[in-house]
Amino acid sequence: MAEIGLRLGADVPFFLRGHNAWVEGIGENITPLTGDTQLAAADFLVVKPPAGLPTDAIFSAADLKRDTEAATMRGFAANAYGFGHNDLQPVAQRLCPGVTQALNWLETHQLQGRMTGSGSAVFAQVQHALDLAKVQESAPEHWQVRLCSNLGVHPLAGWATA
């Protein structure tokens, strides 16, 4: 099933596994995060502006940085929620002003945002008390704003292997 999933998208095999993992290559090399690399529980504010952003537009952009030094799992584990950057973000911000607007909006709530992947959604770890209703009310019209918590293991993990 993971091989079929890989043809659908690089993140599909990861989601089929249902566990936090370090993923390399184009999604085919998956190492579960366990022990000292396991992610701590955390809350996140996820913001989706109304405009979408086609993945192929980002990956075909001439200004996409393609020579970033490889990251390591140990480096990630040392500061998982502050680790690294998303090379897709500058291109996404150029192609979709809503990405920049959402990042700036998060900053008004003292949150450090970054892109979730290759789409227009952004997220920020919430490390302080947050009045969710007030925050959602302050969002521009048609934005989706959700408070989410990470999962160490998805509740349906293992269903695809049974």
Residue ranges with predicted function:
Residues 1-21:
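Conserved post-catalytic alpha-helical subdomain immediately downstream of the catalytic base
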Residues 6, 112-113:
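Residue-level marker of motif borders
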Residues 17, 22-112, 127-162:
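Conserved, helical-rich catalytic subdomain that frames metal- and/or nucleotide-binding sites
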Residues 115-120:
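Glycine-rich beta-strand-to-loop/alpha-helix junction loops that act as flexible
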Residues 121-127:
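Short beta-strand->loop micro-motif that forms the acidic, two-metal-ion catalytic signature
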